[in-house]
Amino acid sequence: HDGYNTDSTDEVLPLGIYPEINVSYEKTNANASPAIYFDSYGHAVVPLLGGIAIRDLNAEETKTLGYFSPKQHDGGGYVIQSSYTFLDSENRIVCPTSNNHVLMLRATDEAGNVLPEFEKVLDIDIKAAAEAALGKELTQNLLSVVFDYDGNLWFATGGFRIYPEREQQGVLGYIAHSAIEAILNGEQADLSKAVFVYGLALGEGAENGIAASKDGAVILTNQNCYLLRAEEGVDVVWCTPYESVGAKVSGEGDKTTGGGLAWGGGCSPSLTPDLVMFTDNADPVKLLALDMKTGEIVASMPVLDDLPEGYQVAVENSAIVYDDSEGTVSTIVCNWFGAGSAGLADPDSDSSIQSYANIYDTNWLTKGNCMIAPGVERVDTVKTDSGYEMKSIWSRNDLSDTSILKLSTATGYIY
């Protein structure tokens, strides 16, 4: 798991010289898997029918080797939320659920063999524990989770679009490492002494994944960016507000029918040892660099601001961030506007439900990337004697993509 959310790797990826393309046909899921994670044995971990599975993606027809189904194995009533699922250092699958629990699943034995039925080794009702700690009802659902460098499990409530005027109550918080270890060892844990929360202002909530470094957990809500630390409670090291014009939707004359996802910045924060990088949701959208120690905005500049007429900008995936350790941080941002469902604006919509029908624009689902706005740009943030400065290195208005781009530093290619 890339806790920095850099979306970059030092691994050698395909060079595109005499490439061989392998195809595996999906005949079980209604859609091809929207996310693929790999464990240390090279197994592909993917969403499957509301659950999670290890599947053979090299077979001519995709085959399931082992899986966990909430319906078959746990009484049903919920689905795995795959967007912010990850694997921990022991190859356990850590996943938030649609009923506000976090699960940890053991998918392989000690030798790396896939278990036909994954073993649930941890199940915590985060919303109930957070409500008990806060002393009031939460009106937002669990969105994302991540471990910090001390093994505490941080969580954030929210959804893919949180409207401030709806005044929902949300929290940021963590489950202490000691409680998680106790549960994994088969012991009882007193969650009243192990779950700590920070109550957000009404209408504030997370819309993204969480990043973690040795400095703490970095969480971006629809209005602020936070650095938080676990100190027998949630220590807010800093809180930095940023700009947003609100949820963006297609208008008269636009070449798209969908919109963006987030009300605020849709770019999960990405980290370097010194900086926090993300985009706001202003008009034009700006890339921001915050000082990791203080939260001060040390550099910013508009991105994707030279698109053809009829296109808007919404950055909804984490950016690629590469720190060369010599004073230059390269960031690559990609436009996503057009893929978001217009139905997210409905007053009774729940943007925490991660399903194709709930999140995505029908025309994008059926017609593909011609229904999203183009735009990919590289911006370098350079350390100078007086601070930092940003400069655009290149911009491509002929590319449209909704997948999370990846960088191989070994090849210098973006995938």
Roles of regions detected by a PLM:
Residues A32, L275-D280, V285, N317-Y415:
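Loop/turn-rich, solvent-exposed surfaces of beta-rich toroidal or solenoidal domains
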Residues H1-I52, Q81-S83:
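Beta-strand-rich domains and repeat architectures in extracellular enzymes and scaffolds
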Residues N5-N22, Y67-G76, E119-E137, G186-G203, ...:
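Surface-exposed loop and turn segments in beta-propeller and other repeat-based domains
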Residues T64-L87, P96-D150, A156-I162, E167-Q169, ...:
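Asp-box/WD-like beta-propeller blade repeats and closely related beta-sheet repeat scaffolds
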Residues I210-D324:
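Long, internal scaffold/assembly segments composed of regular secondary structure
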Residues G51-A53, N99-L103, G159-P164, N224-Y226, ...:
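Short glycine/acidic-enriched loop and turn motifs that connect beta-strands
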Residues T108, E167-A182, N224-L227, L287-G295, ...:
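Beta-propeller blade signature
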Residues E26-Y37, Q72-L87, A129-V146, L202-A212, ...:
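Repeated scaffold domains used in trafficking and secretory/extracellular systems
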